[in-house]
């Protein structure tokens, strides 16, 4: 099973055991509930209690720098893709499209790219071929309320992004629409 957990859920979970856990981001979110960024970060990192493999966005290396962690991400300055702490020269990006072994996967926005790279990291851990994974992702559509195209008319596009409930997620959605 694949489960997405919020800091609210992680805060009260007793058994957090899993085979693989992924941490995509840590932002100063929900401080009204958690009071400090340090407490919020500690709760989010609780996802790694009693787990097999830890996969973390490379942008979080400053918070979690450990030998038992596998990092993923895209380093824009050098156009480097990292999957499970290894540079992947056979994966590259050109014009908001991820390319691998003759397969081209379009994506909308940096946050979507981060999600794709997290998926590829899990697939790599499970020894599932990237080509199969990317081919499957080509048929993926955004879930309802997440940058969901509602209507296009007279060169105007209307999107529903009501799942963006904080400034960071709204900013990410707006940036992806500008691309």
Language-model features: locations:
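Short intrinsically disordered, low-complexity coil segments enriched in acidic
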Residues: 1-8, 66, 76-78, 87, ...
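Pocket-edge structural micro-motifs
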Residues: 25, 57-58, 73, 84-85, ...
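Beta-strand->loop->alpha-helix junctions that form or flank phosphate-binding loops
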Residues: 56-58, 68-86, 109, 134-138, ...
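Acidic-glycine-rich active-site phosphate/pyrophosphate-binding loop
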Residues: 79-100, 143-151
């Amino acid at each position: 099973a694949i489960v997405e957990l919020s800091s609210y859920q992680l805060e009260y979970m007793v058994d957090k055991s899993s085979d693989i856990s992924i941490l995509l981001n840590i932002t100063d979110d929900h401080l009204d509930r958690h009071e400090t960024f340090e407490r919020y970060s500690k709760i989010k990192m609780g996802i790694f209690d009693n787990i097999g493999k830890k996969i973390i966005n490379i942008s979080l290396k400053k918070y979690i720098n450990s030998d038992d962690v596998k990092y993923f991400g895209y380093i824009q300055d050098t156009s480097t893709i990292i999957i499970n702490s290894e540079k992947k020269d056979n994966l590259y990006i050109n014009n908001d499209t991820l390319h691998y072994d003759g397969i081209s996967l379009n994506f909308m926005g940096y946050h979507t790219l981060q999600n794709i790279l997290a998926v590829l990291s899990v697939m790599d851990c499970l020894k599932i071929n990237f080509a199969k994974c990317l081919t499957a992702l080509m048929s993926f559509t955004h879930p309802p309320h997440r940058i969901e195209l509602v209507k296009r008319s007279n060169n105007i596009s209307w999107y529903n992004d009501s799942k963006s409930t904080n400034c960071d997620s709204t900013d990410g959605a707006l940036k992806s629409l500008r691309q």
